[in-house]
Amino acid sequence: MGRNSGFTFKQFHVEHDRCAMKVGTDGILLGAWAPVAETRRVLDIGTGSGLVALMLAQRSRSDCIIDAVDLDMNAATQARENVAASPWETRINIMEGAIQDYQATPYDLIVSNPPYFGAGQSLRDPARALARHTGSLDSRDLLAACDRLLTPVGQVALVLPTAMADEILCISADYDLHGVCYTAVINRAGKEANRVLLLLGRGLNRCEQGEIVIHSAGGAYSDRYIQLTHPFYLKM
């Protein structure tokens, strides 16, 4: 396949024309931020094109295995192709199906860039609507899956709209998951945060607060964003 489409990173390429949700800043932030250095088993819920799984494979130990699940057949197929073309084909497994039905040995780290609009909203593209509609994976479904599939010392890393992050924090204790790190994502200096990178863990924790500003007031990428994404972006 030629590389006249999709998104080329330093060590891999992602085609996403058959995926409802395209490569975007949310996924790139999650893949660059999630604490994967010492993990051996990772689960990516709603992998889409496989972007986050590929980023985590680049950042993790050589013996780390990453399982990635997506409900959409076309996305799962394209994710498999992206993985097959990458340096980590033997370490990433792509599976199609609902996470509510997924069974596996517990994981050290679970990551997700989950759907985030409710029943009152819609999208014209049915596949995109499925990928972004919380009717197929609501907050409690996500937390229940994480509770069931996480080791006793495992962590969950999510990228979420601010309102959804606050909702998750309000109910996560019901699933023995508590805030470890809450990093507000601000698109441009001086604006309010509209996304959150959220890390959850077992047991009560002191939740570390922080922020990442993507663009300075003048529009340039911030030093922090460059530091996070430099291993991936071709021109960083």
From Swiss-Prot:
Gene3D superfamilies in the cross-refs: Vaccinia Virus protein VP39 (3.40.50.150)
Superkingdom: Bacteria
Q: Name one GO molecular function term.
A: tRNA (adenine-N6)-methyltransferase activity
- Could you confirm whether the keyword S-adenosyl-L-methionine appears in this record? yes
* Key words, A-Z: Cytoplasm, Methyltransferase, S-adenosyl-L-methionine, Transferase, tRNA processing
Q: Could you provide one GO biological process annotation from this protein's UniProt record?
A: methylation
Q: Which reaction does it catalyse?
A: adenosine(37) in tRNA1(Val) + S-adenosyl-L-methionine = N(6)-methyladenosine(37) in tRNA1(Val) + S-adenosyl-L-homocysteine + H(+)
Gene Ontology CC terms = cytoplasm
Q: Mind telling me which Pfam families this protein's record contains?
A: MTS
Main site of residence?
Answer: cytoplasm
Enzyme Commission identifier(s): 2.1.1.223
Provide the protein's localization: Cytoplasm
Q: What class of enzyme is it?
A: transferase
Q: What is this protein for, i.e. what is its function?
A: Specifically methylates the adenine in position 37 of tRNA(1)(Val) (anticodon cmo5UAC).
Q: Which family does it belong to?
A: Belongs to the methyltransferase superfamily. tRNA (adenine-N(6)-)-methyltransferase family.
Name the UniProt record assigns to this protein: tRNA1(Val) (adenine(37)-N6)-methyltransferase
The record lists the lineage as: Bacteria, Pseudomonadati, Pseudomonadota, Gammaproteobacteria, Aeromonadales
